[in-house]
């Protein structure tokens, strides 16, 4: 099998290929919280803005933050005029919903700061991968750890993260988020756009990482050439005291 030698534009690949894979998660969370007119929502790690766009379509007043400059630029292009998307979160609005659909342990200091300006009772949503045995993408992600020569890092403990930010638990859920791609090349580009393989690319080279991702994808390539990987994501809802 030969590597997929295609130009890579990570932010655009994220926006055009990968970001939509979590639409079921966004919808489930918004339904759970009743996001709509009157909701003031801040999206942390908002990427190129799809989750914000969906909340705005429900009538919510939204703002976003992401440290990836290229993704922020794309979010500003696609979101309605007047929506603020910055590289650092604004604390100007008294948010009543804060989402972190790609939660990591690194967001804890910023989360503590934001919750101080949030309304009492405001919902904070933290989300991440579900159980490894329920995620077909997990063996593919192990490629990144192996090529970067370190043990696979466990995902963040969402409940501990909420507790560390001084929040009180309010609920949780699991959502099926299958990753479906039109082709193997599309799957490689989408997965590379997540940033999960950046360290592996630095440790080896892009063509090697592409080749090994393709090999790991082989069990999930269907006869028509499409790629289908069932996954489950988990979210935790916590409240500002």
Predicted feature residues:
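Class I SAM-dependent methyltransferase SAM/SAH-binding core
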Residues: 40-42, 47-91
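Conserved class I S-adenosyl-L-methionine
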Residues: 1-39, 50, 71-74
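Conserved catalytic/acceptor-binding region of the Class I
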Residues: 112-113, 121-182, 198
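Conserved Class I S-adenosyl-L-methionine
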Residues: 48-50, 161-241
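Local beta-strand N-terminus motif with an aromatic residue
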Residues: 38, 94-95
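A short SAM/SAH-binding and catalytic strip from SAM-dependent methyltransferases
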Residues: 95-109, 130
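A generic alpha-to-beta junction signature in SAM-dependent methyltransferases
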Residues: 33-35, 56, 79, 118, ...
């Amino acid at each position: 099998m030969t590597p997929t030698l295609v130009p890579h534009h990570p932010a655009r690949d994220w926006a055009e290929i990968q970001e939509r894979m979590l639409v079921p998660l966004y919808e489930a969370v918004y339904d759970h919280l009743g996001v709509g007119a009157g909701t003031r929502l801040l999206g942390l790690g908002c990427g190129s803005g799809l989750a914000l766009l969906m909340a705005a379509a429900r009538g919510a007043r939204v703002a976003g933050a992401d440290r990836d400059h290229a993704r922020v630029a794309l979010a500003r292009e696609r979101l309605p005029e007047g929506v603020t998307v910055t590289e650092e979160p604004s604390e100007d609005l008294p948010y009543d919903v804060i989402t972190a659909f790609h939660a990591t342990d690194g967001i804890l200091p910023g989360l503590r700061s934001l919750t101080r300006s949030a309304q009492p009772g405001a919902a904070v949503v933290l989300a991440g991968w579900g159980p490894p045995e329920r995620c077909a993408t997990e063996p593919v992600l192990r490629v990144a750890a192996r090529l970067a020569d370190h043990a696979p890092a466990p995902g963040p403990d969402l409940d501990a993260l909420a507790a560390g930010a001084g929040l009180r638990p309010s609920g949780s859920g699991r959502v099926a988020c299958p990753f479906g791609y039109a082709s193997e090349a599309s799957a490689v580009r989408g997965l590379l756009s997540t940033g999960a393989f950046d360290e592996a690319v630095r440790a080896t080279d892009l063509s090697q990482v592409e080749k090994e991702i393709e090999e790991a994808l082989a069990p999930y390539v269907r006869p028509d050439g499409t790629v289908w990987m069932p996954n489950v994501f988990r979210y935790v809802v916590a409240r500002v005291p």
